[in-house]
């Protein structure tokens, strides 16, 4: 499983391998209660070695599977943005985090309305996810469960990596890039609340702190239930795909926002490759982002092609 998860190249290092390796390493190095020459240290060393080998094999396997497909999105984890934009990223971070958690409020909404109450609960939940991991880190010395300690460090490793990439890099292009922080925050919060529950003096606090997590889970379940079963059939991409299939047009080219979506919705019965429209005499060029160069050559058994101008 580790090898398969590491086939996604740079992204797998940033979001999967690095937190695990960093969590195990920090937990062992900072455990002053256990001597270096112990069974725990040997187990941790073997874990790091196995994960490192799995990471290497996974990246090799991923490179073999990808072939010539260009994965430009992965460069967002390894490049700096213009320093003049860094402060703008800092200012945008709190709102981006809230919007990622589902904040959707207008300036005309009342505090006592349903939308207002939801917004307030979302703000409290955001504070909960930001503060509880800090409290867990402060209580680190009292936590004896090695798994919880590894999880705490894994969270802070991925948080540090994502924040550097968001504030100083290219991750700020999409708020969904912050989702790894939300994921590890929830895991750390659950593990920490479980630790609190086993202590009699903090059991009531644990129950109270579980309320924000319960709200989020129930709210998300409600949102999923509200989604119509055939909602995807109302999208423009689905309608375009059905039209192309009816016209027996099975291979062509379109802009990024239509090409891959239609290909997936039509289960590759209609294959559309990405092209970029230009203002020069060429008119368009091959879009190599998440594409294979061979897709723009003559295809075996294909005698007609189309260009979607939508």
Identify the meaning behind each predicted range.
Residues 287-310:
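Periplasmic/luminal catalytic loop of GT-C fold multi-pass membrane glycosyltransferases
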Residues 1-10, 16-21:
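Membrane-interface alpha helices of multi-pass inner-membrane proteins
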Residues 192-197, 206-232:
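Transmembrane alpha-helical segments
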Residues 14-49:
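Perimembrane helix-loop-helix junctions
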Residues 60-135:
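Membrane-lumen/periplasm interface segments of multi-pass, membrane-embedded glycan/lipid transferases
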Residues 29-42, 139-149, 195-206:
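Membrane-interface helix-boundary motifs at transmembrane edges
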């Amino acid at each position: 499983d580790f090898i398969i998860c590491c086939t996604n190249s740079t992204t797998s290092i940033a979001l999967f391998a690095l937190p695990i390796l960093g969590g195990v390493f920090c937990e062992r190095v900072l455990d002053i209660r256990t001597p270096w020459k112990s069974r725990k240290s040997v187990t941790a060393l073997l874990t790091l070695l196995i994960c490192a080998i799995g990471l290497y094999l996974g990246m090799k396997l991923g490179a073999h599977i990808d072939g010539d497909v260009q994965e430009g999105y992965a460069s967002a984890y390894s490049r700096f943005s213009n320093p003049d934009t860094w402060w703008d990223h800092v200012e945008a971070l709190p709102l981006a985090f809230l919007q990622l958690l589902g904040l959707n409020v207008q300036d005309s909404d009342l505090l006592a309305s349903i939308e207002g109450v939801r917004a307030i609960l979302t703000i409290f939940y955001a504070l909960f996810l930001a503060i509880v991991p800090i409290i867990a880190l402060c209580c680190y010395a009292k936590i004896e469960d090695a798994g919880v300690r590894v999880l705490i460090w894994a969270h802070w490793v991925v948080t540090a990596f994502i924040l550097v990439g968001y504030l100083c890099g290219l991750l700020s292009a999409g708020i969904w890039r912050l989702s790894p922080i939300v994921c590890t925050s929830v895991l750390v919060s659950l593990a920490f609340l479980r630790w609190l529950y086993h202590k009699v003096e903090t059991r009531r606090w644990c129950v109270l702190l579980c309320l924000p997590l319960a709200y989020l889970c129930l709210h998300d379940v409600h949102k999923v239930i509200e989604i119509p079963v055939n909602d995807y059939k109302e999208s423009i991409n689905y309608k375009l795909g059905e039209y192309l299939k009816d016209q027996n047009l099975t291979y062509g080219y379109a802009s990024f926002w239509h090409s891959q979506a239609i290909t997936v919705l039509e289960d590759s019965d209609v294959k559309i490759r990405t092209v970029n429209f230009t203002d020069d005499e060429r008119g368009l060029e091959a879009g190599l982002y998440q594409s294979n160069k061979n897709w723009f050559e003559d295809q075996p058994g294909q005698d007609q092609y189309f260009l979607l101008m939508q």
